[in-house]
Amino acid sequence: MPFACYFFIFINVGLGEGSALPVGVPVPWPSATPPTGWLKCNGAAFSAEEYPELAKAYPTNKLPDLRGEFIRGWDDGRGIDTGRSILSIQGYATEDHAHGLPSRSTIVTDATINFYFDEIWVNSGTDIIKRGNTNDAGLPAPDYGTFKTYKQSVDGLGAAASETRPRNIAFNYIVRAA
């Protein structure tokens, strides 16, 4: 986007001197370079003498590092995300969940079901033969039918990645410094 377009946005949304936005409020910005009087939220330290109003919002004199991060509303007693404080960082997590595995087992308690991974048990008609991984680590052989290899992965489904994330668009978070 040409500079004139950024300047137009800067003037028309009140990002300049006398802005209605308070000092320290993170704002998504569609450029790598913040406008004059604004700083990137990149974890950098700043001078409280140079930016006294910013130091009131960030008393550690360090901006939050919002590069590659999502902002989440503070729980403030709601009970959705308990134990957090303002400006605290929360790491990656995937919600605990379970997947059912098909089984012909007659055992009814989850605690006693054995699953065999990376191996296949084949009923030859006269015997049950283990194929694939032959290191059974002391697990007993099943006394029925065929076990299939189970793999818990989304790789190859078009959405596999090294993290869990919603769809998103990248912006540069900036704060008004003075």
Swiss-Prot record:
The keyword Transmembrane helix is assigned to this record: no
Pfam families given in the database record: Collar
Top-level division of the source organism's lineage: Bacteria
Entry keywords, A to Z: Repeat
Repeat in keyword set: yes
Family membership: Belongs to the tail fiber family.
Cited PANTHER family: PROPHAGE SIDE TAIL FIBER PROTEIN HOMOLOG STFQ-RELATED
Name of the protein this chain belongs to: Putative uncharacterized protein StfE
The organism of origin for this protein: Escherichia coli (strain K12)
